[in-house]
Amino acid sequence: MRNVYGKVFQNILTRDVEYFLYDPQQNYYYVVQNASKNGYQQSIFTSSVMIALIEEFLLKYNSIVTEIEFLVEDEELNQEIKEILEKMKDNGAYWEILKEKLSFLSKYDSIDIKKVSIKSRQGMGFLLSMQVNGIFDVTENVYDLVATEICNVVRRVIA
């Protein structure tokens, strides 16, 4: 199964959050500029949005977080997060520890999340990755479902 890319935007007039197919071969600046001409501004996934997205997919789609990348390179931090993610596979309660750590990093250390990778174990399952710039890629057969879910969470967090 192949993955399909999407990009999240916000309508400037209605403030609604919407998704559009995205071709990673396209010039990113051109895509954002073209959307702007059509009345949209890009949505950025702040750490608070990313945390809400992770939580939604953990709870609603029986998912596991396979990787979290940060905007800064910190090997010690990466190792600590990797260990928590490993523990989460066997014990979902570690989500609270991870959530607290991610919130703290963002709020007090200005360390933001760059990318999150998730694997859903529900139904046929799917792979999903979400980036700070509002781009996501997901297994093709669940693109609309997951894209709608992402928009709903973004809408809720930024409201």
Name these PLM-found stretches.
Residues M1-A159:
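Intrinsically disordered, low-complexity, charge-rich terminal extensions
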